[in-house]
Amino acid sequence: MSTPDVTAPEVVRENPGASPDYVQSLARGLSVIKAFGAHAQRQSLSDVARATGLTRATARRFLLTLIELGYVRTDGSQFWLTPRVLELGYSYLSALTLPEVARPHLEALAEKVKESTSVSVLDGTDVVYVARVPVSRIMTVTITLGTRFPAYATSMGRVLLAGLNDDELDAYLSRAEFAPITGNTVTTAEELRAEIATVRRNGYCIVDQELEEGLRSLAAPIRDASGTVVASVNLSTHAARYRMETVHDELVPALLATAGAISTDLARTQTHQ
């Protein structure tokens, strides 16, 4: 199945209500970088201009600047990002203790259940992957650090949304845009609110083929020293690989144990900072 591009940037527009310190040219340059993603790794000048809302001439200037800085390469007709763009996010990721704390637990869980495991955080209306141990490829999209998916259609997203207070959840539901990614995807605020209530009762989430057909994912909350949900850990499997009874009896307990272990280590780290 082909999953829609969920990382496409918003078209850059003039922002008359912005702060006097707002730098429009910087916003435009960042939009060019964000135009590239898992579904658009190589793009023409016209593609970039269309994705960002910039003129071809303006998009070309930004692309040439990014080439000079080492963030973009070109063969004369197509443009693509270089690994150097990872530096832009590395300062933030390296400052987090979470990925370092989580990784050994993800590795242990992946070894135990023979499935891929991940940790993500909530950013706006998306989940963003900050740690991952891949075992087998299930999805058609390649998942790496920084990959984003819409929170409403993912197990990790629903766990993170369940950790919000009611006002924060209402704010999310008012601005989220629901799309039927598969025939199983929840597409209304009312349905999602009911799903989140179930997550809060159970302490974990199972999403069955809502982000991609054939993909079943489980997620549980990671909490900091104060008990606040700060991230989510998940494991993903093919929907046909396990009966739902096995999922509840074997995979869920293993996942909850991992979430608890990460939370404990994270709290210990924060206490000693």
Predicted segments with their positions:
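Short, solvent-exposed recognition segments
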Residues: 2-12, 138-213
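Juxtadomain coupling helices with adjacent low-complexity linkers
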Residues: 231-273
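Short hydrophobic beta-strand micro-motif common in sensory/regulatory domains
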Residues: 216-220
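Amphipathic alpha-helical effector-binding/dimerization core
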Residues: 78-176
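N-terminal helix-turn-helix
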Residues: 2-100, 260-268
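Short, structured helix-loop boundary elements
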Residues: 22-26, 82, 95, 99, ...
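Sensor-regulatory modules in signal-transduction proteins
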Residues: 222-225
